[in-house]
Regions:
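Short amphipathic alpha-helix that is part of the acyltransferase structural core
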Residues: 1-34, 50, 154, 163, ...
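Conserved GNAT acetyl-CoA-binding A-motif
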Residues: 99-121
Length: 190
């Protein structure tokens, strides 16, 4: 069993400088100042998943606007010592329960396998999320020079009908300054 706890700014700073720098390439990592700004505005959740002995096993960062019924799973990683032991799946199950009253779905960006530097790893990530109940949508989006496929993970029992492309664009319009959005966010039409 994992215990979900909201991380404070100091914990986030340590997490960012150690874990996030290790777990995510620069092209996929927002700046710490951008994350803190969204967190202070109440739009961003930074959650640690701890074992009963208080050791951090995994973490997740989510963008969740107060007026929306979706949350964007921006980052999820399992500490190296706990990988391949079901910790990531446990965390996803807990995130679904944690957001059940506030969101219908968690939107997930996964690097598109055919565009990824490591196609096998990208396929494994998508398989991890689909095995946890997520559905791969037809939506593809280009964010800051990285091409992503979009998955939808229900927080309840079903996925509501929705224009997921518009949901993603709407989230990024809210998250980014207009000029940054216009320069770095593109929907890819199949």
């Amino acid at each position: 069993m994992l215990i979900l706890k909201t991380m404070d700014d100091a914990q986030l700073g340590v997490l960012y400088e150690t874990c996030m720098r290790r777990d995510f390439p620069p092209s996929e990592r927002k700046s710490l100042s951008a994350i803190l700004k969204m967190k202070h505005r109440g739009l961003y959740d930074v959650l640690g998943a701890y074992r009963a002995d208080g050791v951090l096993a995994a973490y997740a960062l989510l963008y969740h606007p107060a007026d929306g019924r979706v949350a964007l799973l921006d980052y999820l990683a399992v500490e190296p010592a706990f990988r391949h032991a079901g910790v990531g799946s446990m965390l996803l199950a807990q995130l679904r329960a944690h957001y059940a009253d506030a969101a219908d779905v968690l939107l997930i960006e996964c690097e598109r396998p055919k565009a990824a530097p490591d196609e096998t790893l990208a396929r494994k990530r998508i398989r991890f999320y689909t095995q946890a109940g997520a559905q791969l949508t037809s939506v593809r989006i280009w964010l800051f020079d990285v091409e992503y496929s979009i998955l939808v993970l229900p927080c309840g029992e079903r996925i509501p009908a929705c224009d997921w492309a518009e949901q993603m664009l709407s989230l990024y319009r809210q998250m980014l300054p207009k000029a940054l959005f216009e320069q770095n966010v593109r929907l890819i039409r199949a």
